[in-house]
């Protein structure tokens, strides 16, 4: 499925890369990322998934959905939204 199809029901800003890419899975648990995944960064009481971006990129994530300001890593699409929890619900 194309990333742009998952994003069509919400407001977002492309920080880097393209939405015209094929994705395999939608995940919010960094341990479950695989090649061509979209990783949605959820900030929790104990940990902040934004901290795991370098790890998921190494695992092959094709795109990252963030709500905080981050420095993009080359070769990965970065999508910024106001609320990543809402974005995850809309994309599911």
PLM regions: where:
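N-terminal leader/targeting and accessory segments in enzymes
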Residues: 1-90
